[in-house]
């Protein structure tokens, strides 16, 4: 999903930078409020960011100018919402671009928009829609799966907008189909891993999980 350095036309790189900057700025404000009201949430923030970093660093070759990997953005979306998750993703993506040559600076805005904004936003919507209807473990798994798929759907749209050859729909279908080969199984695996981590953390700090998410231990997240 990480679009590599210099791959996008400059006009599109600027567009994604502007949109992402607005959301990340809002996320920083929310993050400050969370840390002020719940300073004990810092370990969960760190775990959410580290989880995203580790999973999104496991890249596989994919379409030209990009790659495939898990995203790890579902956990943060559940715990802190999509705005704060965009801040975590910005830190992760910037570090990967500077240190691992994974992604790029010119394409950072586009990568933040897909992995840090749209993926978590869709995941959060799935979480809200299923909350109270299914067991929390299933809800977490499905949230992570759809957050991953939404990330790659967004990247497919971004690449198709930048390179609409012969037209947008044909380009989108081509990019999306190639991504689907790896992302369908990867997202399912990511969902399972995220659910296992959720169960472990909720057992470890049930009182903190209940305070942050209003989900009672052992309940159906009602």
UniProtKB/Swiss-Prot annotation:
Highest taxon in the source lineage: Archaea
GO BP, sorted A to Z: cobalamin biosynthetic process
Gene Ontology terms for molecular function: cobalt ion transmembrane transporter activity
Membrane topology: Multi-pass membrane protein
Pathway(s) it belongs to: Cofactor biosynthesis; adenosylcobalamin biosynthesis
Entry protein name: Putative cobalt transport protein CbiM
Listed GO CC annotations: ATP-binding cassette (ABC) transporter complex
Transmembrane spans: 8-28, 43-63, 75-95, 107-127, 134-154, 178-198
Compartment list: Cell membrane
Quaternary structure, from the entry: Forms an energy-coupling factor (ECF) transporter complex composed of an ATP-binding protein (A component, CbiO), a transmembrane protein (T component, CbiQ) and 2 possible substrate-capture proteins (S components, CbiM and CbiN) of unknown stoichimetry.
Reported function: Part of the energy-coupling factor (ECF) transporter complex CbiMNOQ involved in cobalt import.
HAMAP family, per database record: CbiM
Keywords for the protein's UniProt record, in alphabetical order: Cell membrane, Cobalamin biosynthesis, Cobalt, Cobalt transport, Ion transport, Membrane, Transmembrane, Transmembrane helix, Transport
One of the Pfam families matching this protein, by short name: CbiM
Organism phylogeny: Archaea, Methanobacteriati, Methanobacteriota, Methanomada group, Methanococci
Keyword DNA repair carried by entry: no
Originating species: Methanococcus voltae (strain ATCC BAA-1334 / A3)
Keyword Transmembrane belongs to the record: yes
UniProt xrefs under InterPro entries: CbiM, CbiM/NikMN
Similarity field: Belongs to the CbiM family.
């Amino acid at each position: 999903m990480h679009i590599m350095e210099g791959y996008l036309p400059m006009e599109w790189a600027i567009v994604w930078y502007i949109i992402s900057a607005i959301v990340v700025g809002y996320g920083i404000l929310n993050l400050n409020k969370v840390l002020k009201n719940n300073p004990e949430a810092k370990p969960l923030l760190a775990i959410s960011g580290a989880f995203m970093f580790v999973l999104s660093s496991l890249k596989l070759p994919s379409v030209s100018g990009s790659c495939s990997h898990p995203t790890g953005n579902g956990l943060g979306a559940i715990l802190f919402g999509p705005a704060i998750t965009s801040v975590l993703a910005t830190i992760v993506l910037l570090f990967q671009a500077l240190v691992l040559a994974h992604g790029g600076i010119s394409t950072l805005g586009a990568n933040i928009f897909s992995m840090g904004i749209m993926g978590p936003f869709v995941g959060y919507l799935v979480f809200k829609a299923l909350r109270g209807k299914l067991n929390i473990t299933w809800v977490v798994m499905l949230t992570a799966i759809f957050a991953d798929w939404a990330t790659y759907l967004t990247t497919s749209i971004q690449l198709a907008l930048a390179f609409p050859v012969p037209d947008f729909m044909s380009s989108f279908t081509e990019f999306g189909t190639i991504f689907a080969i790896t992302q369908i199984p990867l997202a399912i695996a990511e969902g399972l891993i995220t659910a296992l981590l959720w169960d472990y953390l909720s057992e470890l700090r049930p009182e903190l999980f209940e305070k942050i998410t209003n989900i009672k231990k052992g309940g159906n997240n009602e």
